[in-house]
Amino acid sequence: MTTMLEPLRRIAAYAVCTDSVDRVLLVRASERSGTPGTWSLPGGAVDHGEDPKHTVVRETAAETGLSVSVAGLHDVLADMRALPERGITIHTDRLVYQVSVRGGSLTDRVDRPTDLARWFTREEARQLPLRSFTARALGLPTSSADIVPDEPPEFPSFYAVPGPDGLHRAQRFAAYAVVTDPDDRVLLTRVSDGYPGAGCWHLPGGGTDYGEQPGAALIRELVEETGQTGRLVGLLGVASHRDAASLGPEGYPIDWHGVRAFYRVVVDKPAPPTVADVGGSTCEARWFAREELGALPTDRLTEVTAEAVQAARLT
């Protein structure tokens, strides 16, 4: 039984790194890790306030001895695993980046969570005890190296704890969508009073639940916030934002670090928008024609919405 384990949550970034003959770089978990002997992509936890692209460069260097540069986003995944010997269950939101080697040489490690870094062909990797997220990222059959909890524990998507300086801090993973319909309208939501960005138009979406995949979370949030049923078209990117003293309905400053995955979503059969989650962070939802969206003053859009709409070339 895993239901009595303490639930934890983290965000992590990993590297898909291949060489000139298409071998992939993997690292082995040491006896100090929760899954000794298993192999995974190099990477690790995103520090509070850290850009995940910096995380993947830092962690790859530490675990392999190689300096890498980020070429692009490969995938966004989520998984749960139980570690009964430590008394915990961990949900990890994993940002997987494609990287290229700038220099350095492979280095083994002692008394660290990983101990070896090696290059493998895909066929060789297939024979290894791979962490499930690594197998998924490489398009290989998933293994049973991880112990999966019996069921997801209760755990809030927003969870603030006292930081080392005494100020509450929260790191939150969320999924948002640039949503369009067959008439090329764009769906936006308005932020409720009392929340950061109150009164501004925002992308549909929000925090993912414990044990939930980001795509599934986004489709759920779309229904709750707008009453629309959508389908995922593609992954646009990931953004990281820190507000060192964010003010929300809690009524006190929070050192807030948000990591957001952005998707393109299409609603094939649009309906008049309705907000089912009354009293939450969304007070209104509306379809905008392209010209209406382009005419909105910049200060009427949240910063992340303006950036995402521009990236999707909708204005």
Please state what every model-predicted region is.
Residues 36, 106-170, 196-198, 272-315:
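Nudix hydrolase/Nudix homology domain
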Residues 7, 38, 87-93, 111-114, ...:
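A generic structural micro-feature
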Residues 67-76, 229-238:
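A short coil-to-beta-strand element that immediately follows conserved catalytic motifs
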Residues 78-106, 239-273:
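Active-site-adjacent beta-strand/loop module that shapes the phosphate/pyrophosphate-binding cleft
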Residues 1-16, 142-178, 191, 253:
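Acidic, metal-coordinating catalytic segment for phosphate/diphosphate chemistry
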